[in-house]
Every structure is written in structure tokens, then in C-alpha cells.
């Protein structure tokens, strides 16, 4: 067989089901081999969308997502999607075509230094120089992508290597690979675990901060056991949404810049903070000097580089969250059962829980607006009601784009199951929501997949309407349409003297006609009374469906200003954007005036 056929065999050996990609000249041997394979290839309309779809597939399923793009511009178009996966620790293998090995370094047609390009945004980079390397490199790539802290791995495929012959009997696909220098720690150090247990046992105001690492390790059941064993409140990061049902009485919601008041206040008042799979980003901590100043911090993370990077911790524990929590629960359970007298502090903890519950009750958000234009909170409320009415809570995946639509969902939507809320957290990539929904639906065909996006984010990858139309992928697209870059405008309004610049979409398309031009059902909703029925119609449809919600452009999110304390939550009240748009006639007038002045 040739190299390309060996690559297909290697993918099949990894039980890859689907590839998301876009072909090109440097990949023709690969696609020729793919033609003879049972592997499914989903042709996106842009390589960035292929990477986001592979990412959505990985987040929804826990499996490695695979994307592919040709050399040069195909590789550069993958970069944003791969960087998004890297920021959020999503397992991915990104394949790129490359010019023949003898032409590398000669500035050949569509040549680019793909290794240098991907190096900062992947766990590891490979370039296959000989066909005999194919089996081991592919096995190594998948091993690296899904072990330790997951993330993307890049393999560069020169065209001549795809065409050369390989004796697969002499170079079989290995079942295991030895990766020198790569040995992720999974078992927590016993001494550190004992220190953590001692701190937890002495706590009077304990709280858990659960991040994306809980979901990545599959530790949601262990987290729930720990929460209920100790009766400890829990808040999550954006990436941790879904690791515990947000309807649980001890769940406080998301913490941070756009976090809930109970989460932000309780974390700030805690005396022991148990952080699990969280990297303490600036969006979580706010002013680092005022972050959890009363608390002793226990930090559990599989990546030792994250511990102590942003926040000083008292008890660091490196390892897999699931395995560490199992051991913590085992030892705490033993202590509690052995001597209940040691639990005399329970009254103090119960007072803490009483205070937490009181804060939750006083912080219930108003969502039932009947205003026109529609308030985003009303859409979120009706979406949760429809999901309840249809009894699909455990069978629904939400993807979001980035901006106000993302934070309205993160703040107000009650996520109940793991891997059911997919969003770009670390990189904050606009354009992520729609293609990631495609990947999620392919990964979980029996689930209802609903993409929540803004008009700005949707337009960044709206060409993928062609993908869902061609393959009849029944995702529901909900556009929060305010004809504005809402989050940018909110910041300009709050922190830049209300000076509006480049935030209005005066030339946005008619999204209904755009969808219908692809043969996709679509509907515009302008009244709150239409929301419930429209959502049910779209969710029950077995075809793609686009809903365009005309939302109030003056709607804004409460937030913690950048660099402020978590308890410094401000209400954002703003007017309708009224930016003056400079039209082409004005651009031309200035050009001609400058031209005359130069004479």
C-alpha cells in the first residue's frame, strides 16, 4: 500500500469515525485513499469550520476529533480552530498537506512552515519524512491528544510521502508507543491528599470551584459525591458548566466576570477553596490581589504548569481529577463514619449553607420580560421551559458563540448534564458556535443540538449553512440578532465614554432569506409571545432550522469590570446604539480630497 493508504489504516485503527475537512492539491493521494475507505468525510465550506466541527465532536463525545486541510492556505485556515481547541484542552488531531519533501524550504506553490505555524498551539507537532514513520506517528499523535491534559496534535503530510509505498507487515501499527519525556501524572501524591483532607475537615466556609478538568476526566459523579458527602456549595467556570446539575440545591452557577452573585460572593467569603481542573484565568479571578483572600486553596490539576501560575495555593495536587476525588471521598467517608464527633463543626458549616441559600434566594434573576424588542433573558427562559416540556433535558446539547449571547446563556441557562454546554472559553473565538454544533450533532445524532449565536458570530461562519443543507444535519440555529457587536458596544459604553466605533451591522443580511436560499427552514421572531411555539417547531423538526430573534440592542449584562474584585458587580444599562456609519461615498470624497491636496 502507499503512504496515504497507510494513513487511512492508521485512522481506522484509532476507531476514527469521521473527518472534517477540505481537500487540495497536496492532499490528493490522501483523498484518493479515502475514497476506498469506509471513513466518513464531511466537507465543510471553510477549513476553520472543519477545525471547529472536530472540536465540537470531541467536546460532545470525549473522543479525538480529526480535521484536515491542504498545504499553505488550507493550513493557515485551520489555525484559529486548532488554537481554540488548545486553549480549552480539547483532544484533536489536525492533518495538513505539505509540498513534497524535496521542495520544502524552496517557497514552492502553497508551501508554508506548518510546523512553525502550529507549534505554539498544539501539544506536539509531527512531520512525516518517511513512510515507515506513519504507523508510529499516528499512534503517538492520538495517544498524546487524549492523555494527560488533552489537546490538539498536528501531523504534516508531505505529498510524496503519501504516494510512496510502505510494507505494512514490516511496519505494523503499534498497540502502544513509548514517548520519551511524556509521562503525565495521574495519581495524586498521598501526602498532598492527606493535607487536603485535613484542611477540608477544618473548614467552616468551604466551597468547590469546578473547571473544565472535571468534565475532561469524567469526574462529574465523583464531584457530586463529594458535594453531597460534605454538603459543600459548588461554583463552576465557563468550561465547567455541566459538571454538576445547575438545578442542584448546592450549585451556585458560574463564577467570574459574568458570574452569578451567589458564586462570586460565596467564593470571596470562603475559608477553604477546593479548585478542581481550573486554571484560574483572569476572567475567573478578577483582581488577583483580592481573590479569595480569606481562603486556603487546594488546587487539583493534571497539568503541573497550571498550579501556582496565577494564584498561590496552599495544597497543590497534580493528577487526574477523577482518581484524586475517588481517593479523597474514600478517606473522608472513612473519617466521617469512624468518628462523628469530629464533625462537631457541622453547625458552623450549616450556618454557612444557610447564608449561601439566603443569598441564592435573594439573587434570583428576572427573566420573564414581555418587552418588544425581545429581551435575551426571555429567550433563555423559554428555551429552558421548552426543553422541560419536551422532556429532553438529558438529550440536549447547547453550543454558543462568543459575546453577549455566550454570557447570557452561561449566566442564565441551567445546564444539567456533562458535555452538554459547548463554548469557546480560553480563546473566545467568534464563529465557533455554528460549526461546533455540526460536530456535536455528528457525535451525538440522537441528541437535540441547539446553537446559540449572535449575528456577528454567525456571519463569521454562515457559509456552513451549505454543509448542514447538503448533509441534512438537523441542528437548530438561534440567532440573537441585535445588528450590533453587543459585547464590544457594552464595553465602549461602560469604559470608553460611550464612544461607539465599528459596532453596528447596518449591512447585515436577511438571515431568513439567506437560510432559505440553501433550502433551510427559517423563521423570524419579533414578539415574546412567539418564542415558545417557534422553539418547539424548530426543535421537533428533523431538518436544519434557523430562528432569527430580533433582540433589544440596548440589553446588557451585569459584570465585574476587568481587574476589579469579584464582588464589584455592576449593572450595565445602555442606550440603543446610534453610531454614525461612514458610507463609501464619504470614503471616496476623502480620497479625492487627499489626492487634490497632494497636487
UniProtKB/Swiss-Prot annotation:
| Gene Ontology CC entries for this record | acetolactate synthase complex
Residue span of region Thiamine pyrophosphate binding: 404-484
Chain residues that bind thiamine diphosphate: 47
Q: Which domain of life does the protein's organism represent?
A: Archaea
Which N-terminal residues, if any, form the signal peptide?
none
The molecular function GO annotations come to: acetolactate synthase activity; flavin adenine dinucleotide binding; magnesium ion binding; thiamine pyrophosphate binding
Question: Per its UniProt record, what SUPFAM superfamilies does this chain match?
Answer: DHS-like NAD/FAD-binding domain, Thiamin diphosphate-binding fold (THDP-binding)
Main enzyme class: transferase
Q: Which reaction does it catalyse?
A: 2 pyruvate + H(+) = (2S)-2-acetolactate + CO2
| GO BP terms in the entry | isoleucine biosynthetic process; L-valine biosynthetic process; sulfur compound biosynthetic process
How many cofactor units bind, and how? Binds 1 Mg(2+) ion per subunit.
Annotated residues for binding of FAD: 149, 258-279, 301-320
The UniProt keywords, alphabetically, are: Amino-acid biosynthesis, Branched-chain amino acid biosynthesis, FAD, Flavoprotein, Magnesium, Metal-binding, Thiamine pyrophosphate, Transferase
Q: Which CDD domains match?
A: TPP_AHAS, TPP_PYR_POX_like
| Binding-site list for Mg(2+) | 455, 482
EC assignment = 2.2.1.6
The pathway this protein participates in, as annotated, is:
Amino-acid biosynthesis; L-isoleucine biosynthesis; L-isoleucine from 2-oxobutanoate: step 1/4; Amino-acid biosynthesis; L-valine biosynthesis; L-valine from pyruvate: step 1/4
Q: Subunit structure, per the record?
A: Dimer of large and small chains.
Q: Which family does it belong to?
A: Belongs to the TPP enzyme family.
Protein name per the record: Probable acetolactate synthase large subunit
Q: Which organism is it from?
A: Methanococcus aeolicus
The major lineage groups are:
Archaea, Methanobacteriati, Methanobacteriota, Methanomada group, Methanococci
Q: Which gene encodes it?
A: ilvB
